[in-house]
Curated annotation (Swiss-Prot):
It comes from Thalassiosira pseudonana. It is a peripheral membrane protein. Signal peptide: none annotated. Keywords: ATP synthesis, CF(1), Chloroplast, Hydrogen ion transport, Ion transport, Membrane, Plastid, Thylakoid, Transport. The keyword Chloroplast applies. The gene is atpE. GO terms for cellular component: chloroplast thylakoid membrane; proton-transporting ATP synthase complex. Its main location: plastid. One of its GO terms (biological process) is proton motive force-driven ATP synthesis. Produces ATP from ADP in the presence of a proton gradient across the membrane. HAMAP family: ATP_synth_epsil_bac. It is found in: Plastid, Chloroplast thylakoid membrane. InterPro entries: ATP_synth_F1_dsu/esu, ATP_synth_F1_dsu/esu_N, ATPsynth_dsu/esu_N. This is ATP synthase epsilon chain, chloroplastic.
Length: 133
């Protein structure tokens, strides 16, 4: 069985498709969703959303939000998304190193928080590259 999934930002529809399986970046870990899942509303962290249809995974980087799951329908409301385009592995690795260094050298809690968000995005980019290659 397949389920419907919609990914929405405040200003546009990112995708509206069907899926065999969805993996969401929850605040306490990944949330796997299959057809017939119990009704659930969950907060999402910055991370990688994975949508599987016909043995093909599609990754999307989410920047926090909410997901509503109702048996065969998943609605993802996010602040923003980052599209994965042809990013070089070496470039993504450099971004991860830069974000790690920014956390280590942060002098204020705001700088540390901003750096941690960038670290989550950089980690999601690397995970996404693995799905694209």
């Amino acid at each position: 069985m397949v389920m419907d999934i919609r990914v929405l930002t405040p200003d546009r529809v990112i995708c509206s498709t069907t899926a065999d399986e969805v993996i969401l970046p929850g605040l306490t870990g990944q949330v796997g969703v299959l057809d017939g899942h119990a009704t659930l509303i969950t907060a999402l962290d910055t991370g990688l959303l994975r949508i599987k249809l016909a043995d093909k995974w599609t990754p999307i980087i989410l920047c926090g939000g909410l997901a509503e799951i109702d048996r065969n329908r998943v609605t993802v409301l996010v602040n923003d998304v980052e599209e994965l385009v042809a990013v070089e592995l070496s470039e993504a690795t450099k971004e991860l190193e830069k974000a790690t260094s920014a956390i280590e050298n942060a002098e204020t809690s705001k700088a540390r928080l901003d750096a941690s968000v960038e670290l989550k995005k950089a980690t999601a980019r690397l995970e996404g590259i693995n799905y694209l290659s």
